[in-house]
Amino acid sequence: MSAEARKTETIPEWKQEEIDELVAFLERYESVGVVDITGIPSRQLQDMRRDLHGTAALRVSRNTLMERALNEGGDGLGELVEHVEGQVGLIGTNDNPFGLYQQLEESKTPAPINAGEVAPNDIVIPEGDTGVDPGPFVGDLQQVGANARIEGGSIKVVEDSTVLSAGEEVSSDLSNVLSELGIEPKEVGLDLRGVSSEGVLFSPEELDIDVESYRTDIESAASAARNLSVNAEYPTARTAPSMLAKAAGEAKSVGLSAAVESPDLADDLVSKADAQVRALAAQIDDEEALPEELQDVEQPAAADSAAEADDEDDTGNVEQTDESDADDADDADDADDADEEDGDGGDALGDMFG
C-alpha cells in the first residue's frame, strides 16, 4: 500500500467529507481566491456573505483542509496554498479576477480602531467643532496630539492634527478619543491575497488598476492600429469598409479632376462647371456677364463642395486654373470692348457661355 493511500486512510471521515465539499466548491467557479478575514466580527462576516450572494461565494474552513482541497483541485489552484495563513477563507466567482477585486474593494466599510491595533494609514483629527461641551475631553485631545481648545462654549480642533502615523500602534487613549469623535480610521472587508483563474495566479497589486484609464488606453491603441492598417493599405475585416470608402472617394476626385463623363459624377460635374462659370463672371466688370438663364438661379450648394474637393485632390493644378481663369477674363474683356462697339454685348456673351 502506498504512503499516499495510508495517509488518506488516517484522515477522519468528517475531514474527508469537508475536503470533498471544498473541492466541489472550487470546481464550481472560474476564479478562486484566498481572502483575509482577520478582525472581521462574525456578524459583519455574515453581512458580507449576504452582499456577495449572486456574484461570489465565501467558504471558511480549517487551513489544513483548505490546503488539501487546493492541492487536489488542480488547474494551478495549488499555488494559492502559500496564501493560506492566519484567518483566511476561500472565495469563488464566475467573474474575472479584476471584477472580483473591484467588488471586494467597493464592499469595504469604515470601522473604529481598537487599542493595540496597527494604524493602516495616518490618523488625522480634522479641524472643526467637535460638538463636545467644555470639560476634560479637551485635555484628552491635547494629550493625543490634537491642537484643541475651548471656543464659544464648545471644544474645537483649530487645525488638522495628525495624531498617529501609518504602521504605529493605537493606544488606549487615542482609541477612546477617536470613538468619542466618531472617527473610523480603518476599513473592514475581505482583503484578497491572491486569485487563480484558468491556471494563472494574480496578486492584488496586479489587479489594482484604474479601469477607466485602462479602457481609454485600449481604445486609443485600437484606434491607432486601425489608422495604421488603413494608411498602410492593409485590409482586415474591420478596416476593409473604410478602405473601400476611401478608395471610392479618391476615384471620384480623380473623375472630377479629369472631367470623366459618368452617371455617378454628372451632378458634381455640372455643379463644378456652374461654380467655374460664376467665378469667371465675377471677375468681369459687367452685370450682364453671367448668362441670363443663370442670373435668377441660386448657386447649388453642391457647387462649393465639388469645387473644394477638386481643390484638395488636385492642388497641383491650382495655379494653372487661376492663370486659365485670368486669361479667360482677359479674353472676355476684349470681347466686351468689341461688342460695345457693335452695340450687342449681351448677345456676344450669350454666345460665349451658351
Curated annotation (Swiss-Prot):
Region (Disordered): 286-354
RNA-binding listed as a keyword: yes
Molecular functions (GO terms): large ribosomal subunit rRNA binding; structural constituent of ribosome
Keyword rRNA-binding among UniProt keywords: yes
CDD domains: Ribosomal_P0_L10e (cd05795)
Keyword vocabulary terms for this entry: Ribonucleoprotein, Ribosomal protein, RNA-binding, rRNA-binding
Biased amino acid composition, Acidic residues: 286-296, 307-345
GO cellular component: cytosolic large ribosomal subunit
GO biological process: cytoplasmic translation; ribosomal large subunit assembly
Family: Belongs to the universal ribosomal protein uL10 family.
Function, in words: Forms part of the ribosomal stalk, playing a central role in the interaction of the ribosome with GTP-bound translation factors.
Subunit structure: Part of the 50S ribosomal subunit. Forms part of the ribosomal stalk which helps the ribosome interact with GTP-bound translation factors. Forms a heptameric L10(L12)2(L12)2(L12)2 complex, where L10 forms an elongated spine to which the L12 dimers bind in a sequential fashion.
Protein name: Large ribosomal subunit protein uL10
Name of the encoding gene: rpl10
